[in-house]
């Protein structure tokens, strides 16, 4: 009976439009923030556009696998976003990972097996050689920015930017920093900040470099 039931479930899933199912499920999910839901809906729209362009829409969950996701990655890399430019590597990786994250919600309801579809094997792409959209700052460049003589609002914005560079946190998490979460490092050497990131549920401890401490003391 178990095998008959499983076979019946598989046949039913083949008749389900995965994109519609994901969109409808997100609309009814009250466990996520409105901002997160809006972002997920936008990611589904991007994925739907890809499926339409490659002639694979509508699609069911049994046809969503790692090769398809890699095709989506290539599609994003080659899609122009303005005047001959293509989407930067980090953005491509983030878009693909968000789709996989959304699909994990479907796994919770038995619609897809992330391991069987090999989606858990996906790795974010490395920066492409000659990727003009990728912009990095060296430590020396960050130091030069911090050394600029600024006052008032410009100084505050510069300090916040440099602090984000050195602690690696998003703007909303950086804004939440206060004296109460600055602590001595467990090894007694230096200081750390302990925060619960906005999009995470666990506490993280981040070592503070001297320049970061200098900014926080202002």
What are these regions (language model features)?
Residues 86-89, 93-97, 108, 112-171, ...:
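Basic, Lys/Arg- and aromatic-enriched nucleic-acid-binding interface segment
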Residues 54-58, 80-88, 116:
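Short helix/loop segment immediately N-terminal to the Walker
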Residues 120-124, 176-217:
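Conserved tyrosine-mediated DNA breakage-rejoining catalytic core shared by Y-recombinases
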Residues 36, 40-43, 91, 95-98, ...:
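Hydrophobic (often cysteine-bearing) scaffold residues that line and stabilize catalytic clefts
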Residues 43-50, 71, 75, 91, ...:
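Alpha-helical scaffold segments in carbohydrate-active enzymes
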């Amino acid at each position: 009976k178990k095998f008959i039931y499983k076979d019946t479930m598989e046949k039913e899933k083949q008749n389900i439009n995965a994109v519609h199912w994901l969109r409808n499920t997100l609309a009814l999910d009250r466990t996520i923030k409105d901002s997160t839901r809006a972002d997920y809906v936008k990611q589904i729209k991007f994925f739907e556009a890809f499926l339409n362009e490659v002639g694979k829409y509508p699609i069911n969950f049994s046809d969503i696998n790692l090769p398809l996701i890699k095709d989506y990655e290539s599609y994003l890399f080659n899609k122009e976003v303005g005047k001959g430019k293509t989407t930067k590597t980090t953005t491509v990786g983030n878009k693909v990972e968000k789709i996989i994250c959304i699909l994990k919600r479907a796994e919770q309801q038995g619609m897809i097996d992330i391991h069987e579809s090999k989606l858990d094997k996906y790795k974010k792409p490395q920066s492409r050689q000659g990727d003009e959209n990728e912009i990095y700052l060296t430590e020396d460049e960050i130091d030069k920015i911090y050394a600029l003589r600024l006052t008032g609002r410009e100084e505050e914005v510069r300090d916040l930017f440099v602090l984000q560079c050195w602690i690696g946190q998003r703007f909303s998490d950086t804004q939440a920093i206060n004296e109460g979460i600055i602590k001595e490092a467990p090894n007694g050497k230096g200081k750390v900040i302990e925060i619960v990131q906005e999009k995470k549920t666990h506490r993280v401890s981040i070592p503070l470099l001297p320049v970061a401490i200098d900014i926080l003391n202002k």
